[in-house]
Amino acid sequence: MPQKEVTIPVPAKGGSNKEEDKKDNKDTEEKNTTTNTTTKDNKKDKKKDKKEETLSPEDEKLKNDLELLVERSRDEKEEIALAALEALKTEIRSSTSSMTSVPKPLKFLRNHYSTLVDIYKNSKEGKAKTSLADILSVLAMANGNDERDTLKYKLLGSGEAIASWGHEYVKHLATEIGVEYDIKKEENQSVEDLLKLVDEIVPFQMTHNAEPEACDLLLEVEQLSKIFQYIDENNYSRVCLYLFKCSYYVPGPDDINILKVCVEIYIKMKQYPDALRVAMKISDPELITEIFKLVENNKSILQQLGFLVARQKIVPDNFNYDSISDIINNSKLSEYFMNLATDLDIREPKLPEEIFQSHLDSTSAIADSARMNLASSFVNAFVNAGFGKDKLMTAEEDTKWWFKNRELGILSTVASTGMVVLWDIDGGLTKIDKFLYSQEKHCSNGALMAIGMLTSGIRSEMDPALSLLAEHINSSNTGTRISAIFGLGLAYAGTQRQDLMSLLSPCLDDDKEKMEFIGIVGLALGLIFIGSCDPELSTLFVQTLIQRGTAASESHARFLHLGLGLLYLGKQDAAELALETLKAIEGKGGEYARLTVEACAYAGTGNVLKVQNMLHFCSDGQENPHHGLAVLSIALIAMGEELGSDMCLRMFDHLLQKGNVHIKRAIPLALGLLSPSNPRIAIMDILSKLSHDNDPEVAQGAILSLGLIGAGTNNARIGGMLRALAVFYGKDVHLFFVRIAQGLLHLGKGTMTINPYHSDRTLMSPVAVGGLLALLHAGLDIKNILSTQSHYLFFSIVCSMYPRMLMTLDEDLKPLPVSVRVGQSVDIVGLAGKPKTITGFQTHTTPVLLGYNERAELATDDYIPLTNILEGIVILKPNPNASVTSPLASKKN
């Protein structure tokens, strides 16, 4: 196209007037601008012309043919119009079968969309009009308006199969159905026409690797139950995995309904272990019992379900399967753990000095020897936990180690024996027995606590903890009573035994005892009846808080509040009545109780509104000692949910900069709760900085949390940090916490975890959370509780301890070493096909240790696991279809 001529004016000669010069310059600038604009327009025109000219002969022909068909579609003769429309359909279908780029027919017809709409409006009723509606429905995808024309014209169309228009069309249609459904529901209009389309779309999506889209559509139109008729062997796992993850982002009670659909699908496909996991997630005892009934004739599956329930530390209601009672009771956990220790060659006991890797400076040892001996006792217990022997407390030659401690230090030192012999009832009781009848009261009290620790998570027909501890509940010595009651709380956490309620609940009414005793009674009852929502016990707690009045604000009263909160752990709306009742309690005690109950009720849910409530409480402008509890509550609510945890880190960063002293003291503890036994570098760096803070309580909390996030991992980086801190705080009270953290880091010589999440991080163990919360609530007043007389509360962590192993057994429950691949787990939610679930794997022979983010899969096809998640104790059965070259097949032949 020829460029337009532009005339540039020549300025007149002569005349030096400034105003005229300015005027001339202005005119020149305007003309130059006009010239530039004209040149740009010319360039655009040239590009446009060039683009039009570059159409290939085939494209040019297609464009002309389509324009001709559009023109003929307005023909008055229906036969001609219908033929033209059918030809248009053929052209569009041939291009929409693969939507890798914008199809050319849609591109060329886009400019004719309004023309076709006018033709439709002016057409008479008949086949031609409905056929044109089908075409308009497809073209509306490229139109880009918000009128939902794709759905509108689909409903007006001929009703032909949507599959013929391709996947992209179906996806677009499903999106518009979701929006239209909400609008019609608000206006109380019929949605039958939409549901008919849904019944057509869902089968198409389910058979074309689009299960997530099918689930989304059914969720939006509230018809999720229809998914059952489309489930088969090929798609059930992807559907359930997607629905399970969706439940995190759906408010109640819809989240429970989604999870129940998952359970029904798993039961339909006979995936009973997976069904049981989801039922435990819902925390529905009836559903759990029903699943057990379905497999009562299948011994191997029944045993595998028993191992899953034992890991969660719960007992199903009306349980009467004697054949697996040993499994449910965790009776053989010690045996399996010792097999792991033997295989890893780590049974030899370690001394605390081997963990410290440097002897204490002589001057500091003399200045605070009793305190450092106490620290060594804790470290010895943590490091040798579960191995049955150590070099300080259970050695054959009596070292009299406990004599090197003073008063309550003796209690904790003797109690540490229970952690060394953890889970081994037969062998452990004999090693504790020698302390039980000592004339030294602190020694015998420590033995009572040790018995409780020994049987934590283990059930036995002999019931040794109850028979040995019950007689001391009404002792005249308060220390003895506290030891026995705390021991019972650790031993029977999560059992919800009514005989223990009748035994312990009268202790709450004891007016003669101080708040420390009442607090420990409340904590023990909370641990035993964790998540039970027991109304009788809840009422008793509230009455005690009211009766105690101002004493309910004392430091140890926090454990009474925590006990009440634990009753509602994870129960969400079930805690509303208790929260309303607590509003009647005025003062700081009532406020602490309300915050604790609300946080416990929504533990691990990631509930954004509750997190906002806690943040709002922190920002009220007044310096409130309970701000620290609100910070800890944020971590409790967000834990276990990856996105929420990341958001918490950012919140805590802001709170560190702007918050008051109570907030700053709680943040290290909150970080420890957010990531136990999972040493994330971001958290590690924050805690490393805070461990040098000028406020001693901030520094001590940070040091303790370094131990919590690295617990049982032997993490080299944290180990280096703690050794440096031991030198830095060589003559300081902080050294006690450095030693505790070093002991936690090497928990069980690196074989245990305190993280409450298991089964590929999908299930939260309430008992494990309870143990962590007991320690962290004590940490909120670290100066007056953990640093002084109540250091025995460090042992509450025993409720959270569990071997982080994968052990494979045959159908006779004998160890069966097999090759497994262990690597970083990969999020495969919403991915089509069968993608890899791990990356960067290494091949090992079971038993093996698994890290927080690690997952395992069998590296051989000789066996089939009875559960899809290889974690903890897994039963394998021989694969009847094993390849001929495999060792198992050769052995059979």
From Swiss-Prot:
Cited Pfam families: PC_rep (PF01851), RPN1_C (PF18051), RPN1_RPN2_N (PF17781)
Superkingdom: Eukaryota
SUPFAM superfamilies xref list: ARM repeat
Composition skew (Basic and acidic residues), residue ranges: 16-32, 40-59
GO molecular function annotation: enzyme regulator activity
Keyword Repeat among UniProt keywords: yes
Single biological process term from Gene Ontology: hyperosmotic response
Region of interest (Disordered), residue spans: 1-59
Residue ranges of PC repeats: 412-445, 446-482, 483-517, 522-555, 562-583, 666-700, 701-735
Gene Ontology CC: one annotated term: proteasome regulatory particle, base subcomplex
Keywords: Proteasome, Repeat
Functional summary from the UniProt entry: Acts as a regulatory subunit of the 26 proteasome which is involved in the ATP-dependent degradation of ubiquitinated proteins.
Family statement: Belongs to the proteasome subunit S2 family.
Entry-linked PANTHER family: 26S PROTEASOME NON-ATPASE REGULATORY SUBUNIT, 26S PROTEASOME NON-ATPASE REGULATORY SUBUNIT 2
Official protein name in the record: 26S proteasome non-ATPase regulatory subunit 2
Source organism: Dictyostelium discoideum (Social amoeba)
Record gene name: psmD2
